[in-house]
Amino acid sequence: MCRKPESSGRSAAYHERCVKPCILVFASWLLMACCLSAAHADSDMPGREDTICGAIKERFVFWMWSRMAPMPNPARALGRKGVEAVSFTTGDQKVLSGYKFAAHDQSGKPVEPKGYVLMALGNAMIADQMIGELSRYAAAGYDAYIYDYRGYGLSEGKRRINAIIEDYREIVSDLNSKYQRKMLYGVSLGGMVMMNVIGSGVEFDAAVIDSAPSRLSTYGCPSRIDPVNHLTEAVAPKILFITGKRDQVLGPKDTRELREKGAALGAPTIDGEYFAHPYMDESYEVQLRRARLVENHLLNRTRVQDN
């Protein structure tokens, strides 16, 4: 979590850890708009690990994003009580690495899970870094899952948008066969992934999409993966859309269309006055408020209003 330092002595570290990655991510999105796209057609069905947003561009952007992610450190995750390593083998036989935070009671004793929560990460995050953020769901009696995208952390495969979307569709389908209540949580790039999964017709009970781009077709990707094109009246009321007025990674022009279409179709929405990009909020208090909004929607289906 990025928190603004209390003293000037920590400002350099804060800039390196929080500000610099933010600038680099934003620059990479601009690069997507500037690079030439490889020819593609929306009707073409590419191979799983084919590039769909430009052969050079997609490879370079994912390479850049992956370099911003920390090195994998399983001990960081497995040092937490209730966390175990898990893996998922995709349809093209790539093994994705992740973690499960097992459902437990207030004393930490394992309990029969009520359902599951699956988180799809932002582009510079890895699973062992973020599994702790799902502890509240395990404590509420749900198994919480998080995976490294293919080509990230300890996961096999090439870093490709098309493959990542298909991976998560398969993961959700597998989890749906094992649990009663089904909850999805996507941040930034992960929000785009989850909207595509939802658009494929999978069952889910509640979802939160935090700061996802409305479209990727403006950057040379096929319109079939635009999150806004997967939003329908049937699914919108089950999805909470969160954006932030202080987001310097994906601004209003990137996120507004998806949020406003969601609201028009009956989705609860939040455009937080003090929210930045997910996990880049300036204070712990702001981040905690955001986390509680996510938790309330996923666990209780509490309807929230624009602020």
Model-derived features with residue positions:
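C-terminal catalytic histidine-bearing segment of alpha/beta-hydrolase fold enzymes
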Residues: 264-307
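An N-terminal hydrophobic leader/cap segment in hydrolases
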Residues: 39-89, 97
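Short beta-strand element of the alpha/beta-hydrolase
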Residues: 112-122
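Conserved alpha/beta-hydrolase
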Residues: 138-154
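The serine-hydrolase catalytic nucleophile loop
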Residues: 123-135
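Alpha/beta-hydrolase active-site loop
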Residues: 158-177
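The feature captures the conserved acid-bearing segment of alpha/beta-hydrolase catalytic domains
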Residues: 212, 217-263, 271
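Gly/Ala-rich beta-loop-alpha elbow adjacent to hydrolase catalytic centers
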Residues: 186-194
